[in-house]
From Swiss-Prot:
Quaternary assembly: Part of the 30S ribosomal subunit. Forms a bridge to the 50S subunit in the 70S ribosome, contacting the 23S rRNA.
Taxonomic superkingdom: Bacteria
Protein name as catalogued: Small ribosomal subunit protein uS15
BP terms from Gene Ontology: translation
PROSITE patterns: RIBOSOMAL_S15
InterPro entries to which the protein is assigned, alphabetical: Ribosomal_uS15, Ribosomal_uS15_bac-type, uS15_NS1_RNA-bd_sf
Protein keywords: Ribonucleoprotein, Ribosomal protein, RNA-binding, rRNA-binding
Gene Ontology CC: cytosolic small ribosomal subunit; plasma membrane
PANTHER family xref list: RIBOSOMAL PROTEIN S15, BACTERIAL AND ORGANELLAR, SMALL RIBOSOMAL SUBUNIT PROTEIN US15M
Function noted in UniProt: One of the primary rRNA binding proteins, it binds directly to 16S rRNA where it helps nucleate assembly of the platform of the 30S subunit by binding and bridging several RNA helices of the 16S rRNA. Forms an intersubunit bridge (bridge B4) with the 23S rRNA of the 50S subunit in the ribosome.
Organism whose genome encodes this protein: Mycobacterium tuberculosis (strain ATCC 25618 / H37Rv)
SUPFAM superfamilies: S15/NS1 RNA-binding domain (SSF47060)
Phylogenetic placement of the source organism: Bacteria, Bacillati, Actinomycetota, Actinomycetes, Mycobacteriales
Family membership noted in the UniProt record: Belongs to the universal ribosomal protein uS15 family.
Gene Ontology MF, one: structural constituent of ribosome
Length: 89
């Protein structure tokens, strides 16, 4: 299921650099993480939904590239974000 406007606002408020921040890597990674979690739950129920599985793999790849970018520009921001989101690294 797609994220509602309220869910997006809450995520952006928590992870963005300021109130209306939508473009920072932290905000983008947080939104992707929520979408990935939702798709993962969907695929647990609908195991043969291969179109959604492909979409999930694309989202994971996009998040991986953003995480790599933020780790190269500022290691402290990277470590903080990984800890806050509870991602493995």
């Amino acid at each position: 299921m797609a994220l509602t406007a309220e869910q997006k606002k809450e995520i952006l408020r928590s992870y963005g650099l300021h109130e209306t921040d939508t473009g920072s890597p932290e905000a983008q990674i947080a939104l992707l993480t929520k979408r990935i979690a939702d798709l993962t739950e969907h695929l647990k129920v609908h195991k043969h939904d291969h179109h959604s599985r492909r979409g999930l793999l694309l989202l994971v790849g996009r998040r991986r590239r953003l995480i790599k970018y933020i780790s190269q520009i500022d290691v402290e921001r990277y470590r903080s974000l990984i800890e806050r989101l509870g991602l493995r690294r």
